[in-house]
């Protein structure tokens, strides 16, 4: 192959790579506007889309051999693994069958609806014996959905089996998944997947990718090992300065509360705090319910010196008086005007007119079709608060444990753990302390660098490393308590995953604290900002039972691996910001520092991108077990793939020499981090989908 052909091949490969990334991004936004069926027909399942991936695979394979990558075993196997995955996906797209089947109790069925339109027949029949829903003890929250079936083969052989969430029934290459059920529990809906070859080939690609990535990290000739030995990481001469400031709030005293108002005495309220009740499909201490109630209404976990328990008890005992207490937070100025109130706190009676008609009912009729209207959101929030008070007055909010012994009470240890968790605002403390330490230490570090003052191994540096270890341990305690209280791994919603990302950031900072002087300040800053977002987004995260489909150790691993990748990408981004700042200020005098930051970023890029890839495909395995398909082009899946593809480009320094240039590399990783933000926040708030926490 001549040089001209090689250049053409490289340009075609790069152009096609960029085109596919762009097409994927555009498709997610089109899906949000025109719906999933449209993008499936014109993008994901269209011939041109299949052709693009095919050409990319073929040209990529030719390019790999043209570059003689077989001489680098790990790199060669990594690229071959992607080709194997594409082949598996092609087999699935061409020969795989997917459909849905409905079966009534006591009946047999052998026909299913394939691709939503075609009636297809199974080589056997399946009979539904019973459909049941199991619940969490003492609650109405479903723990699992189970279809008990009998498979009847043509030779009269019968096979019994249960199909439930994360429990698939496989028979003669067909896989059955629990999808839905009839409201009267007399029938079940099962998803069907028949793709024995495509799944096997794709899984082979996943395994090959994981093994080659591990091989790359440990191979003596790999770029990762070369970066580990780079002298820039061995001669860092920076130090830290920390001025620790204790942040505290002046407590509101009981004297600030108007004493003329009838209230529930504190001595009785305190004694009731550990009383066990049913709330949000969990057994909780009364303190949890009271705290949620007060925080929902007033925006704070206490009210003018009264504890949350006193607030709830006072509403119960003296409802007529408390209906005229302005403690219902209304943030929307427009809604304040419509309710006729001054300020941001309303009374319960402000929501009803002189004829005792509910004011929000008429408002809702005018805004219910405006999904993005701020007033609509304000009306919904206010209505939830009024509904909460109504439930309390009707006796449906507080439910005691049944006396028949059907529900086992919580142990005293678990009750005390939840009371402690409610009392200590882990997220608030951590984000305030971490951001304060992070900003001060980074400011001092930059001052020292500008002045060329080396202060290596100082007392302040050791203190900083000790403090970030303390922050990690304190954060670990909060995450552990959250998991212990909820009896599950706390990674099932947006708040919990952000908490875990922050934990990963602190963990990485502690792990790499000796590699660069910037690691510890970055660890404090990055974790602090993540915790701030978590705190602002959900100041009162309710602990609820996990959805049945989320009960999977594979899902927990999937989320954990991706969160660690996000944390590393965050460090790389902060490295880029500082490196570009120093380069713009005086690149010659700060050359050593810039080199250290660049090497550190390139070093972290390996585990970050490898974890991203492995996390994506662990998620694909979980999806195949739970939903019957390993890839659905859901917006979150698509943007995770985009993130992986974008960051993977930075490894190709020989094909794209610009990545060897310091400024270009750091600008690239800054722009690339936008894909991480889009994957985590953008999809949730803009695009939606099965993975969205909306």
What would you call each of these model-derived segments?
Residues 1-694:
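Solvent-exposed, non-transmembrane regions of integral membrane proteins
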């Amino acid at each position: 192959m001549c040089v001209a052909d090689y250049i053409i091949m490289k340009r075609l490969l790069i152009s096609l790579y960029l085109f596919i990334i762009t097409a994927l991004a555009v498709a997610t936004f089109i899906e949000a506007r025109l719906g999933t069926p449209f993008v499936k027909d014109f993008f994901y399942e269209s011939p041109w889309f299949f052709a693009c991936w095919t050409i990319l695979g073929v040209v990529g394979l030719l390019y790999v051999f043209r570059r003689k990558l077989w001489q680098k075993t790990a790199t060669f196997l990594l690229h071959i693994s992607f080709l194997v995955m594409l082949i598996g996906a092609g087999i699935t797209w061409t020969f795989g069958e997917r459909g849905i089947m409905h079966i009534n109790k006591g009946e047999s069925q052998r026909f299913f609806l394939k691709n939503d339109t075609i009636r297809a027949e199974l080589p056997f029949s399946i009979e539904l014996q019973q459909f049941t829903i199991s619940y969490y003890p003492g609650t109405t929250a479903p723990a699992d959905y189970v279809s008990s079936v009998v498979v009847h083969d043509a030779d009269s052989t019968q096979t019994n089996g249960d199909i439930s969430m994360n429990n698939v029934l496989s028979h003669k290459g067909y896989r059955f998944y629990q999808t839905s059920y009839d409201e009267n529990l007399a029938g079940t809906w099962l998803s069907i997947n028949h793709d024995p070859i495509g799944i096997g080939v794709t899984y082979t690609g996943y395994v090959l990718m994981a093994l080659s990535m591990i091989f790359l990290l440990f191979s003596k000739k790999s770029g990762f090992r070369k970066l580990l030995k780079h002298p820039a990481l061995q001669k860092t001469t920076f130090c830290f300065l920390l001025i620790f400031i204790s942040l505290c709030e002046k407590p509101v005293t009981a004297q600030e509360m108007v004493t003329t108002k009838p209230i529930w005495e504190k001595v009785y309220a305190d004694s009731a705090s550990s009383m066990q009740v049913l709330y949000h499909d969990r057994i909780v201490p009364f303190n949890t319910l009271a705290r949620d109630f007060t925080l929902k209404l007033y925006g704070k976990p206490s009210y003018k010196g009264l504890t949350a328990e006193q607030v709830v008890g006072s509403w119960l005992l003296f409802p007529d008086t408390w209906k005229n207490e302005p403690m219902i937070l209304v943030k929307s100025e427009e809604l304040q005007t419509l309710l006729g109130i001054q300020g941001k706190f309303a009374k319960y009676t402000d929501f009803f007119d002189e004829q005792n008609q509910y004011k929000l009912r008429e408002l809702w009729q005018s805004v219910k079709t405006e999904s993005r209207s701020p007033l609509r959101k304000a009306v919904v929030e206010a209505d939830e608060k009024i509904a909460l008070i109504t439930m309390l007055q009707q006796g449906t909010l507080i439910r005691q444990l049944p006396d028949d012994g059907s529900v086992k009470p919580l142990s005293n240890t678990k009750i005390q753990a939840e009371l402690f968790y409610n009392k200590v605002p882990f997220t608030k403390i951590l984000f305030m302390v971490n951001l304060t330490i992070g900003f001060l230490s980074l400011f001092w570090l930059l001052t020292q660098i500008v002045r060329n003052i080396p202060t290596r191994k100082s007392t302040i540096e050791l203190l900083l490393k000790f403090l970030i270890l303390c922050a990690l341990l304190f954060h670990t305690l909060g995450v552990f308590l959250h998991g212990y209280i909820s009896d599950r791994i706390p990674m099932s919603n947006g708040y919990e995953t952000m908490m875990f990302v922050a934990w990963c950031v602190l963990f990485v900072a502690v792990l790499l604290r000796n590699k660069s002087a910037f690691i510890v300040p970055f660890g404090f800053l990055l974790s602090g900002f993540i915790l701030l977002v978590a705190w602002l987004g959900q100041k009162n995260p309710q602990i609820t039972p996990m959805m049945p489909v989320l009960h999977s150790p594979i899902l927990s691993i999937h989320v954990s691996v991706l969160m660690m990748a996000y944390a590393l990408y965050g460090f790389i981004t902060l490295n880029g910001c500082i490196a570009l700042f120093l380069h713009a200020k005086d690149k010659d005098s700060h050359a050593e520092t810039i080199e250290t930051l660049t090497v550190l970023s390139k070093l972290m890029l390996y585990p970050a991108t490898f974890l991203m890839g492995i996390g994506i495909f662990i998620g694909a395995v979980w999806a195949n077990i739970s939903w019957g398909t390993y890839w659905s082009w859901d917006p979150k899946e698509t943007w995770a793939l985009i993130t992986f593809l974008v960051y993977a480009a930075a490894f190709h320094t020989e094909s794209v020499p610009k990545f060897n240039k310091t400024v270009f590399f750091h600008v690239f990783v800054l722009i690339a981090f936008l894909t991480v933000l889009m994957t985590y926040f953008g999809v949730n708030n803009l695009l939606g989908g099965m993975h969205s926490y909306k």
